[in-house]
Regions:
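Hydrophobic alpha-helical transmembrane segments and adjacent short intramembrane/lumenal linkers
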Residues: 78, 83-173
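Hydrophobic core of alpha-helical transmembrane segments in multi-pass integral membrane proteins
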Residues: 36-42, 168-175
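Juxtamembrane boundary at the C-terminal end of a transmembrane helix
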Residues: 171-188
């Protein structure tokens, strides 16, 4: 593991501060594709074990493409929220450069997910635990990235991420919950 990558994962403030100063879009894209591709490859290869190899690669490519679009759109949502709230010191390109590095916990958790897929049905708890751990670690790195790029404190960047997750919940999950509840009331 390169020293810069280690700094991003474990010494977040200093490592991210160095990366924001240099443009690292291609390296960030490489780490994103590697992290999300390997993690989703381990999980989906176990799920689609009976399918042909081309189908499994297509599922991995689709997962990486969808995750890339979602992550970049989420980065622009965060940039818009912070710009609306008055954090004008930020750089959207610097934030997008750091977003690929925030997926590195999935690369670290890939061996754990592989172990979970080899354990059978009880191993699914290990896979779910690895996924939850990687997502929480990714959110922490995202908070640190906002802190470094926009020169704000930890509490404000935490509040921004929490607010953005609440907005996404209201926009995408809440309508589905309401429709599901209405259907259950109509059926029952």
């Amino acid at each position: 593991m390169r020293r810069k990558t280690f700094d991003i994962l474990f010494e977040t403030r200093d490592g991210m501060r160095l990366l924001v100063q240099e443009r690292c879009m291609w390296r960030s894209l490489w780490y994103f594709a590697l992290s999300v591709g390997l993690f989703s490859g381990v999980v989906t290869n176990q799920l689609f074990l009976d399918q042909a190899l081309s189908v499994r690669f297509a599922v991995i490519a689709a997962a990486v493409s969808i995750a890339g679009v979602v992550l970049s759109m989420y980065g622009f949502l965060l940039h818009g929220i912070l710009e609306t709230l008055g954090a004008m010191a930020g750089d959207a390109v610097g934030l997008i450069c750091l977003l690929g590095y925030t997926t590195l916990p999935f690369l670290v958790m890939t061996p754990v997910a592989l172990l979970g897929t080899k354990l059978g049905l009880p191993g699914m708890l290990v896979v779910v635990g690895a996924c939850i751990t990687a997502k929480l670690w990714m959110l922490y790195l995202l908070i640190r990235a906002l802190q470094v790029v926009y020169l704000i404190d930890f509490k404000r960047s935490l509040a921004t991420v929490a607010f953005s997750l609440l907005l996404l919940y209201i926009a995408f999950v809440l309508p589905l919950q309401i429709v599901f509840e209405l259907l259950m009331l109509k059926i029952g």
